Swiss-Prot record:
<dbReference type="InterPro" id="IPR006062">
    <property type="entry name" value="His_biosynth"/>
</dbReference>
<keyword id="KW-0368">Histidine biosynthesis</keyword>
<dbReference type="GO" id="GO:0000105">
    <property type="term" value="P:L-histidine biosynthetic process"/>
</dbReference>
<dbReference type="GO" id="GO:0005737">
    <property type="term" value="C:cytoplasm"/>
</dbReference>
<dbReference type="InterPro" id="IPR013785">
    <property type="entry name" value="Aldolase_TIM"/>
</dbReference>
<feature type="active site" description="Proton donor">
    <location>
        <position position="129"/>
    </location>
</feature>
<feature type="active site" description="Proton acceptor">
    <location>
        <position position="8"/>
    </location>
</feature>
<keyword id="KW-0028">Amino-acid biosynthesis</keyword>
<dbReference type="GO" id="GO:0003949">
    <property type="term" value="F:1-(5-phosphoribosyl)-5-[(5-phosphoribosylamino)methylideneamino]imidazole-4-carboxamide isomerase activity"/>
</dbReference>
<comment type="similarity">
    <text>Belongs to the HisA/HisF family.</text>
</comment>
<keyword id="KW-0413">Isomerase</keyword>
<dbReference type="InterPro" id="IPR044524">
    <property type="entry name" value="Isoase_HisA-like"/>
</dbReference>
<dbReference type="Pfam" id="PF00977">
    <property type="entry name" value="His_biosynth"/>
</dbReference>
<dbReference type="GO" id="GO:0000162">
    <property type="term" value="P:L-tryptophan biosynthetic process"/>
</dbReference>
<dbReference type="InterPro" id="IPR011060">
    <property type="entry name" value="RibuloseP-bd_barrel"/>
</dbReference>
<protein>
    <recommendedName>
        <fullName>1-(5-phosphoribosyl)-5-[(5-phosphoribosylamino)methylideneamino] imidazole-4-carboxamide isomerase</fullName>
        <ecNumber>5.3.1.16</ecNumber>
    </recommendedName>
</protein>
<dbReference type="InterPro" id="IPR023016">
    <property type="entry name" value="Isoase_HisA-like_bact"/>
</dbReference>
Length: 236
């Protein structure tokens, strides 16, 4: 199991949001400095979200993210505003290890297969953002049916992995809800990475025992509620 420190980028800065709300942003400085700090503390992978992309500017921060990939040299998964095959291709060609396809995957699931056949399924991750058991899309503003049903469909279409985010608890640092995670893992055979609510060693141990492939650490890491050292120790 891997721990992915989050590097969420908005306006060229590393930020953390609460519940995905732009107005809740707390600024943590230069994204590359944040990324470098996590690597120095033992991270071997990063979860990079282009929030400007999620808020409508698809190629915002491209040069910065390319630099981050080049300078860090570690595994990077990237999401945020990938709304077309052209967007996906542009980001894959920056050298990120995999891209996270969210709303686009629910609108055009066949895109997952198209991209997987071109770049390999391992580089295509489908985002399963769930609210009240439903998949949440369009910046979590709309829901479109049972999240497990969508997850199995994404796997059938060619996604090589899934990013499960529990929108109900994301950014609140209140702990993970394991039941939906376990339900999802039972339904699919591809790796599942979990985001949302991960805020203690116990959360990470629970996820590890449930069989997840990775966990994203965001708000709890930046606020100091958990250290990266504690997180890495919890999954040994």
């Amino acid at each position: 199991m891997k721990v992915f420190p989050a590097v969420d980028i908005l306006g060229g800065r590393c930020v953390q949001l609460v519940q995905g709300r732009r107005e809740s942003a707390t600024d943590f400085g230069d994204p590359l400095s944040c990324a470098t700090q996590w690597l120095e503390e033992g991270a071997t992978a990063l979860h990079v979200i282009n929030l400007d992309g999620a808020f409508g500017k698809a190629q915002a921060n491209a040069a910065l993210i390319r630099d981050l990939v080049d300078v860090t040299g570690v595994e990077v998964q990237l999401g945020g505003g990938i709304r077309s095959i052209a967007d996906a291709t542009a980001w894959l060609e920056t050298g990120v290890d995999r891209i996270i396809i969210g709303t686009l995957a629910t609108e055009h699931p066949e895109v997952l297969g198209t991209l997987a056949s071109e770049y390999g399924g391992a580089r295509i991750m489908a985002g399963v953002d769930a609210r009240d058991g439903q998949i949440a899309v369009e910046g979590w503003q709309q829901t479109r049916g049972n999240f497990c049903t969508w997850a199995t469909r994404f796997e059938e279409q060619g996604a090589g992995s899934l990013l499960y985010t529990n929108v109900d608890i994301e950014g609140l640092q209140q702990g993970v809800r394991l039941d939906p995670v376990k339900e999802l893992i039972r339904m699919v055979s591809i790796p599942v990475v979990v985001a949302g609510g991960v805020s203690s060693p116990a959360d990470l141990q629970g996820l590890h025992q449930a069989g997840v492939a990775g966990a994203v650490l965001g708000s709890a890491l930046y606020s100091g509620k958990i250290t990266l050292e504690e997180a890495l120790k919890a999954i040994q």
